């Protein structure tokens, strides 16, 4: 006996709903998480460079030739150390490369690097907003496909 047309339509609607839900959870949400994780790493790098800028500015203000400090060797194990010459600093360029720079050169590098990281974080934020818009569009499509009514947004109190 043949399946009635209405039953076949419901089966295809159910299959479409399942495919859309799978696409949302397996592709879009995973992509969104990757973009947000990448943006968080960029924010961490930006934070490190801004901290370095503050340290360099304090070094320039105090004009000390020696610096006493504690260095973290790992696992929160600190040792006291003396930096004999604070006129030059080693800056991590990336990919394991370090460069010895004067404090003024380091500030220029930090300004350029922080502006690039800010642009990258802005781009990643736009990408995440696009992915969120795609997720919202897919959910609206699912709502229409299932014939659900649009529920009102909860009002903020």
From Swiss-Prot:
GO CC list: centrosome; cytoplasm; cytoskeleton; nucleus; RPAP3/R2TP/prefoldin-like complex; spindle pole
InterPro entries named among the record's database cross-references: Prefoldin, Prefoldin_subunit_alpha, UXT
Primary localization: cytoplasm
Superkingdom: Eukaryota
Subcellular location: Cytoplasm; Nucleus; Cytoplasm, Cytoskeleton, Microtubule organizing center, Centrosome; Cytoplasm, Cytoskeleton, Spindle pole
SUPFAM superfamilies, A to Z: Prefoldin
GO terms classed as biological process: apoptotic process; centrosome cycle; microtubule cytoskeleton organization; negative regulation of transcription by RNA polymerase II
Keyword Cytoplasm carried by entry: yes
Keyword Transcription: yes
GO molecular function list: beta-tubulin binding; chromatin binding; transcription corepressor activity
Pfam families attached to this UniProt entry: Prefoldin
Assigned keywords, A-Z: Activator, Apoptosis, Chaperone, Cytoplasm, Cytoskeleton, Nucleus, Repressor, Transcription, Transcription regulation
Similarity field: Belongs to the UXT family.
Quaternary structure note: Homohexamer. Component of the PAQosome complex which is responsible for the biogenesis of several protein complexes and which consists of R2TP complex members RUVBL1, RUVBL2, RPAP3 and PIH1D1, URI complex members PFDN2, PFDN6, PDRG1, UXT and URI1 as well as ASDURF, POLR2E and DNAAF10/WDR92. Interacts with LRPPRC. Interacts with androgen receptor AR (via N-terminus). Interacts with estrogen receptor ESR1; the interaction relocalizes ESR1 to the cytoplasm.
Function recorded in the entry: Involved in gene transcription regulation. Acts in concert with the corepressor URI1 to regulate androgen receptor AR-mediated transcription. Together with URI1, associates with chromatin to the NKX3-1 promoter region. Negatively regulates the transcriptional activity of the estrogen receptor ESR1 by inducing its translocation into the cytoplasm. May act as nuclear chaperone that facilitates the formation of the NF-kappa-B enhanceosome and thus positively regulates NF-kappa-B transcription activity.
Entries under PANTHER family matching the protein: MEDIATOR OF RNA POLYMERASE II TRANSCRIPTION SUBUNIT 10, PROTEIN UXT
UniProt-recorded name of the protein: Protein UXT
């Amino acid at each position: 006996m043949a399946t009635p047309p209405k039953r076949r339509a419901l089966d295809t609607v159910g299959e479409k709903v399942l495919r859309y839900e799978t696409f949302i959870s397996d592709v879009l949400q995973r992509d969104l998480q990757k973009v947000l994780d990448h943006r968080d790493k960029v924010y961490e790098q930006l934070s490190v460079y801004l901290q370095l800028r503050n340290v360099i500015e304090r070094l320039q203000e105090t004009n000390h030739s020696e610096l006493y400090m504690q260095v973290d060797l790992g696992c929160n194990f600190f040792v006291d150390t003396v930096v004999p010459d604070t006129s030059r600093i080693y800056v991590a360029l990336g990919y394991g490369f370090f460069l010895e720079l004067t404090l003024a050169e380091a500030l220029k590098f930090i300004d350029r690097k922080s502006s690039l990281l800010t642009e990258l974080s802005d781009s990643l934020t736009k990408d995440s907003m696009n992915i969120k818009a795609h997720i919202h569009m897919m959910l609206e499509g699912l709502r229409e496909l299932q014939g659900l009514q649009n529920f009102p947004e909860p009002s903020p109190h």
